[in-house]
């Protein structure tokens, strides 16, 4: 079996741990691999200042400042971190929804005594037959059919 063989099948906690381990190993793999040689980043040229003695603000041949474009080398890493964050958040939400649904289902099965769902106006309470004469009286709830 895989690395999650010690966890019960279908365990949301196990799935979260497996996802976390995958993310950590994925980041370590990227950190260990040498960075690939990327082509020179495209740059946008903006005028630094107008030439002395020139009336126009954008003179041809003016010294230009280079500004890196919107694409940065950290964009894939940031995008990957965002995807991991969204996936982990979705897994946590799904875990809590499933856990809530399971506890509600168990409560319906195990609840023997509680508030009756029927209208109390239609109930007829009669004492149960007992040999003891105690202060506690138990009543049998029967719906009267009128």
From Swiss-Prot:
Q: Which UniProt keywords apply?
A: Glycoprotein, Membrane, Signal, Transmembrane, Transmembrane helix
Query: Which residues does the annotated region (Disordered) include?
Result: 43-75, 125-146
The residues exposed to the Cytoplasmic compartment are 102-146
Q: How does it sit in the membrane?
A: Single-pass type I membrane protein
Q: Which residues cross the membrane?
A: 81-101
Q: Which residues form the signal peptide?
A: 1-30
Q: Where is the composition biased (Acidic residues)?
A: 129-138
Identify the residue ranges that face the Extracellular compartment according to the record: 31-80
Query: Which residue positions carry a glycan here?
Result: 55
Cellular compartment(s): Membrane
Q: Which GO terms describe its cellular component?
A: membrane
- UniProt record similarity statement: Belongs to the FAM174 family.
What's the protein here called?
Answer: Membrane protein FAM174
